[in-house]
């Protein structure tokens, strides 16, 4: 894989979508992307055509349709397998840049730390699902669970967003542990949008300016 794969992670309400929008405006003219290459922005769940259908199943807030924790894990895995096969791998092999709103570490945080599914089981599944795709750099936009809930107070929540604060706390602690690995950059998402954006841009320039 020759392109660059960037992932934005964090609990709901941390501003991932906003920052990806900022990057999509800046990156094409940043000098980082080689001539002839493109920028692809995507998300999980729902980055592929099949994924959009799976997203509806996963996030449906009808309590009568609530999947078991294991079924939820496998739905996310199916979404990711299709996402990697149809979107991520072809783009990277074409020298394109891919920025994804969530990837496999969200599954570790939400289904592993949040749902208490054995982490080794998840890692084994992901080793198959990801098909060798691994982020070059992951940004963790960190906010407190309390701030997450406050920011989303006027929104209609999906099923995952409807979980209580204890679930969010477990997920957030999971992200903090995962973010200790290399190729992660932790940024406080309590700052204003432009400050966060500038920190992301600076990190990208520092990491990839010599790879043009």
Swiss-Prot record:
GO molecular function, one term: dTMP kinase activity
Keyword Transcription: no
Pfam family, any one: Thymidylate_kin
A Gene Ontology biological process term: dTDP biosynthetic process
Entries under InterPro entries matching the protein: P-loop_NTPase, Thymidylate_kin-like_dom, Thymidylate_kin_CS, Thymidylate_kinase
E.C. no: 2.7.4.9
A single Gene Ontology CC term: cytosol
NAD among keywords: no
Reaction catalysis annotation: dTMP + ATP = dTDP + ADP
Keywords from the named record: ATP-binding, Kinase, Nucleotide biosynthesis, Nucleotide-binding, Transferase
Residues annotated for ATP binding in this entry: 10-17
Domain of life of the native organism: Bacteria
Disulfide cysteine pairs (residue numbers): none
Reported function: Phosphorylation of dTMP to form dTDP in both de novo and salvage pathways of dTTP synthesis.
Family stated for the protein in its record: Belongs to the thymidylate kinase family.
UniProt name for this protein: Thymidylate kinase
Organism: Prochlorococcus marinus (strain AS9601)
Highest classification ranks of the organism: Bacteria, Bacillati, Cyanobacteriota, Cyanophyceae, Synechococcales
């Amino acid at each position: 894989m020759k392109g660059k794969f960037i992932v934005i992670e964090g609990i709901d309400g941390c501003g991932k979508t906003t920052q990806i929008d900022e990057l999509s405006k800046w990156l094409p003219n940043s000098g980082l992307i080689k001539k002839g290459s493109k920028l692809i922005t995507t998300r999980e769940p729902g980055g592929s055509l099949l994924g959009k259908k799976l997203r509806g199943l996963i996030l449906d807030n009808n309590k009568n349709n609530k999947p078991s924790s294991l079924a939820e894990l496998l739905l996310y895995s199916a979404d990711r397998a299709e996402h990697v096969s149809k979107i991520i791998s072809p783009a990277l092999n074409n020298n394109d840049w891919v920025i994804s709103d969530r990837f496999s570490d969200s599954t570790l945080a939400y289904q592993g730390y949040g749902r208490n599914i054995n982490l080794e089981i998840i890692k084994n599944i992901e080793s198959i699902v990801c098909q060798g795709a691994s982020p070059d750099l992951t940004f963790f936009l960190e906010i407190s669970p309390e701030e997450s809930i406050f920011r989303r107070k006027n929104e209609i929540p999906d099923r995952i967003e409807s979980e209580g604060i204890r679930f969010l706390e477990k997920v957030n602690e999971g992200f903090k542990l995962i973010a200790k690995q290399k190729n992660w950059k932790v940024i406080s998402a309590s700052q204003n949008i432009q400050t966060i954006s500038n920190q992301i841009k600076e990190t990208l320039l520092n990491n990839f300016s010599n790879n043009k």
